[in-house]
Amino acid sequence: RYYYASRGLGDVYKRQTLRIREGDPLEIFTDREGEIILKKYSPIGELSQFAGEYAESLAQTTGHLVLITDCDHVVTASGTGKKEYEGKPISKQLEDAISERKNFLASRNDAEFVKVTLDDAGEFGQQALSTIICEGDAIGAVILYEKDEKSRMTETESKLAIAAAGFLGKQMEQ
């Protein structure tokens, strides 16, 4: 899966403005009008159909909203509320949690709780998050989200997120 950034000649943009991190693989093209097109490679994008099926199965089993992200966007979502998240850019908080390779279970009032997307309404009260690691690199996250604060997430949800992240990371290595 690729993400495109196209800018006219003469426009100067910082690497951070385009959400390009040091070491990110890019392809550079020019079109007929002379515009530069950057294609950013997303390793999880290769597994988007498989990741979607995995998320759907996990959502049906747990009853939670399940999100699978790369380091830039929500790649797939399954469960109640998925339309609000699928394809949206992730928040700086989540980007930091991924780069720090965090795995946690948190409630909305906990310091570790992160907004998933830039425009996350904050209607979910609990989350279990696990970073996807592939060949030693943090490439995304698996997040289980729960709206109802009365039905507490447990270590089971945390372990399910960790197992899903581990499995997806191993699939990427093949």
Task: Spell out what each predicted region is.
Residues 38-41, 78-81, 117, 147-149:
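Short hinge/gating elements
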Residues 15-77:
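Intrinsically disordered, low-complexity terminal regulatory regions
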Residues 56-119:
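Structured interaction and signal-relay segments at domain junctions
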Residues 45-57, 88-96, 141-174:
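Juxtadomain coupling helices with adjacent low-complexity linkers
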Residues 2-9, 13:
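Single conserved hydrophobic/aromatic residue that forms the stacking wall/gate
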Residues 126-133:
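A short, aliphatic-rich beta-strand micro-motif
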